[in-house]
Amino acid sequence: RRCLVGSEMCIRDSFLPRNNFDAQETCRTIVESELTKSNFSIYGWRQVPVNPKVLGEKADRTRPEIAQVLFKHNNKDLSGKNLERKLYETRRKIENEAIKKSLSGFYICSLSSKSIIYKGMFLAESISDFYIDLQDERFVSRFAIFHQRFSTNTAPSWDLAQPFRAIAHNGEINTFRGNKNWMKVHEQEMDSNLFEDIENLKPVIQPGTSDSAALDNVCLLYTSPSPRDIS
C-alpha cells in the first residue's frame, strides 16, 4: 500500500447526488477534467465511510454521497499560499462547470492541501459517530475548528451546514442583501495577475447560499490571492 506523504498532497472532500448515478459520474468527470487542466495528477477517489444510523429521518433521506479525491500538483515547487490560490481557482472552475450542466446535489466541502471539512445534518456530538474516519487513531491534526449552528433564516441542508471553508459563523447578517448586491458591482472591477483568468472566480457569491456561506465566499476571495489574514 503506497503512502502518499508531503505538504503538497491535496484532498477534495465533496457531496455528490446519492441517488443519481449518472449525475455522480458527470460530477466526477468535471472534477477530473478541471484538475487535469490545472496540471494536477489524480491518485484516486475514496468513498468516505459513514454511519447513517445516527441520522434523523430527514437528514438520512437527503444524505449525499460523500467522496474524496486525492491529487497532487505536477510542479513540486508550487506550495503554501501559491498552491492554495491555484486550488481556489480550480474549485471555482469546477463549480461553474457544474452550474452550466445544472447539476444539483453537488457541493465541494473543501479543496485544500491544508484542511478537510467534515460537516452534516446531525447533532454535534455525533460527528465522530457519523464520520468513521474520526474514530481512527491514525487520523491526526495539529488543530481543529468546530462549530455548531441551528438554521434560522434558511432551510437546513447538508451543504449549508457549518463549518464552511474559511469560517464558522452564526450568520444573522442584517445587511446581507445590500452586501451581496455591492459584491456583484465590485466584480465588474476585479482584476489580478495572480490568477489564470479572473472570470473563473465569478460570481464571487454563489447562488442559493446563506448569509454566512456568502461571507465565506468573500473571505476566500480576499485571502486566497494574498498573504492577508481574515482579521
Question: What role is predicted for each listed range?
Answer:
Residues N174, M190-S224, R228:
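Conserved catalytic alpha/beta cores of large enzymes that bind or transform nucleotide phosphates
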Residues T62-T154, Q162, R228-S231:
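Active-site pocket-lining segments that scaffold enzyme catalytic pockets across diverse folds
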